């Protein structure tokens, strides 16, 4: 995910972030399935998706902590 995309995610609402997180988790599931069956063309995509999931989870957690303060 590029820096510009991260800035856009930080300004989006939590419902959009949760939806995007669900989409990425589904994509990761499909990529792992393709890897197991030997059909995955770009194994680096798994790493990219996992990193994007972590970034979105971090943004969601930052918002939760900001609300508590």
Curated annotation (Swiss-Prot):
PROSITE patterns: RIBOSOMAL_L29 (PS00579). It comes from the Bacteria. GO terms for cellular component: cytosolic large ribosomal subunit. Keywords: Ribonucleoprotein, Ribosomal protein. One of its GO terms (molecular function) is structural constituent of ribosome. The keyword Ribonucleoprotein applies. This is Large ribosomal subunit protein uL29. It comes from Clostridium perfringens (strain 13 / Type A).
């Amino acid at each position: 995910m590029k820096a510009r995309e991260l800035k856009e995610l930080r300004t989006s609402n939590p419902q959009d972030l949760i939806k995007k997180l669900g989409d990425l988790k589904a994509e990761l599931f499909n990529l792992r399935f393709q890897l197991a069956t030997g059909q995955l063309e770009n194994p680096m995509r798994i790493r990219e998706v996992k990193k994007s999931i972590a970034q979105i989870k971090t943004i969601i957690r930052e918002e939760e902590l900001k609300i508590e303060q």
